[in-house]
């Protein structure tokens, strides 16, 4: 199915003990990314993270990273071979494709990407049969803007240009929009099976609506004592905006960017103490030790995971864990941090 179509659719902190990965350099605290992915997992874009089918009549679909892969495989079902461009266990910010990736994209029937600047400039140079930008039609937030529910990343000087916040998939309502865009793209390529894609999308959207209802009932009730939480990086603005919560973050839009100043750790500690926060959220694809350092400075402090759902590890992939399950884990961990009874 190779017709050329392009759509834009839809304090003092003791850190010496962890010098192996958390290093003071010229007065700044720098984290190294956690790299515990095995070689087998790194081949995920062509093997492990591909839906299982062998027929030549299947649509060849590539999604830029995990949540879009998960959305697309639920919509495409057994009529599509869906793979993820970014390998398993890899933090996708600032990732760039290899020559092999580009060839695969050129041969695909459909390339689904997040948009809103998430994939970087390379996305504009990709030529493929059908490019699907899932951010089209969404009112985007700008990184660093508070929208009444986002605090500037703690201790970060306002020296960088404001950037678009790409983390739309973390709002289940906007994720529903992305699924609808993907559904329409499948129908555009395979009109004969439109009812199949509509039915698959409807089932998955029902699951997203259930997650939305769970968040409202479990996190927004009077049983929750807090409305503020501290995420590791600035990924939850859309989520916080949707559910009337306030996100504070240790780092900015990208979890890999910049140095972490010692005084910033003190700021986080002081803010947490002021607001009664005892939970610092780490992430599943970055080194958790900084969050542990901060949590150790807070009375009764602890570290839990708040996943930006940018990827899964190989074990989770093998277990069939997807967006819905990761969001459910986030709800459970937020209930602890927000002190919900």
Regions found by a protein language model. Name each.
Residues 2-341:
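Extracytoplasmic metal-acquisition and chelation regions
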């Amino acid at each position: 199915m190779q017709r050329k179509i392009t759509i834009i659719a839809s304090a003092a902190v003791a850190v010496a003990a962890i010098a192996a990965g958390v290093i003071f350099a010229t007065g700044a605290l720098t984290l190294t990314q956690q790299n515990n992915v095995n070689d087998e997992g790194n081949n995920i874009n062509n093997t492990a993270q591909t839906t299982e089918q062998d027929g030549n009549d299947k649509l060849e679909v590539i999604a830029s990273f995990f949540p879009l892969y998960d959305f697309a495989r639920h919509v495409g079902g057994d009529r599509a071979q869906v793979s993820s461009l970014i390998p398993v266990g890899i933090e996708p910010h600032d990732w760039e494709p290899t020559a092999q990736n580009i060839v695969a994209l050129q041969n695909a029937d459909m390339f689904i990407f997040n948009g809103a600047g998430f994939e970087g400039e390379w996305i504009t140079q990709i030529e493929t049969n059908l490019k699907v930008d899932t951010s089209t039609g969404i009112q985007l937030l700008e990184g660093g803007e508070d929208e009444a529910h986002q605090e500037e990343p703690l201790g970060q000087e306002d020296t960088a240009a404001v950037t678009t916040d790409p983390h739309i998939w973390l709002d289940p309502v906007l994720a529903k929009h992305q699924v609808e865009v993907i559904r329409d793209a499948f129908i555009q390529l395979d009109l004969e099976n439109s009812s199949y894609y509509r039915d698959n999308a409807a089932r998955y959207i029902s699951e997203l609506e259930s997650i939305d209802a769970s968040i409202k009932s479990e996190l927004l009730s009077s049983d929750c004592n807090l409305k503020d939480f501290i995420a590791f990086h600035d990924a939850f603005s859309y989520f916080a905006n949707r559910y009337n919560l306030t996100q504070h973050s240790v780092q900015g839009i990208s979890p890999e960017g910049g140095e972490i100043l010692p005084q910033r750790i003190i700021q986080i500690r002081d803010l947490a103490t002021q607001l009664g926060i005892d939970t610092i959220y780490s992430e599943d694809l970055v080194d958790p030790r900084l969050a542990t350092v901060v949590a150790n400075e807070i009375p009764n402090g602890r570290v839990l995971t708040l996943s930006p759902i940018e990827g899964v590890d190989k074990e989770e992939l093998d277990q069939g864990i997807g967006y819905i399950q990761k969001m459910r884990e986030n709800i459970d961990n937020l209930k602890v941090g927000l002190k919900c009874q």
